[in-house]
Amino acid sequence: MTKGLSWGWTAIKYLAVFLVIYTAINWWRQPVMPANPDLQLTDYQGQTVDIAAMSHDSPVLVYFWGSWCAVCKITSPTVQSLAQSSPYPVVTIAIQSGDNQELRQYLKAKSFNFTTINDEEGDIFKAWQGQVTPSFVILKDGEMTQGLTGVQPEWSLRLRLWLSSVF
């Protein structure tokens, strides 16, 4: 009995250390909102997307990804599901994923129909000091409330958007 209890405490300690390290790495790698960000952008179809205005109605999830990113192949379907079924707007920024025609073909092949800004040269991502893809930012009232990186389950993104709408 003592052996089982000891194992349980060891597992809890390792979990706590893992969570602290995971949180620290995520905090360090998260994008940083520029001082004067350009939040009125044009999507790959030529439509104006005013993220700041959208964020005054409800929190907006901004998803930085690339067609070349292996992890994004896991997270993009989650973002697609969220964009289709969530009351919160989703805007994606495709980083260095080709010209508008190549991006259009990629999105069509994957059946993604979320709003997408084509960051052909990666300038938007650089302005946000992005370090890794995928990266997520939640904006509310034109301000960044949360930044995340890596694989994020849909329930976590939904919860974070809801919390941003409440607080």
What are these regions (language model features)?
Residues M1-T42, F167:
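N-terminal targeting signals for export/organelle localization
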Residues A35, S58, Q131-V132:
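Short, small/polar residue-rich loop motifs at catalytic or cofactor-binding pockets
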Residues T42, T115-D119:
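Short acidic-hydrophobic, aromatic-tinged amphipathic segments that line or gate anion-handling sites
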Residues D50-K73:
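Short active-site neighborhood of thiol/selenol oxidoreductases, capturing the structured segment around
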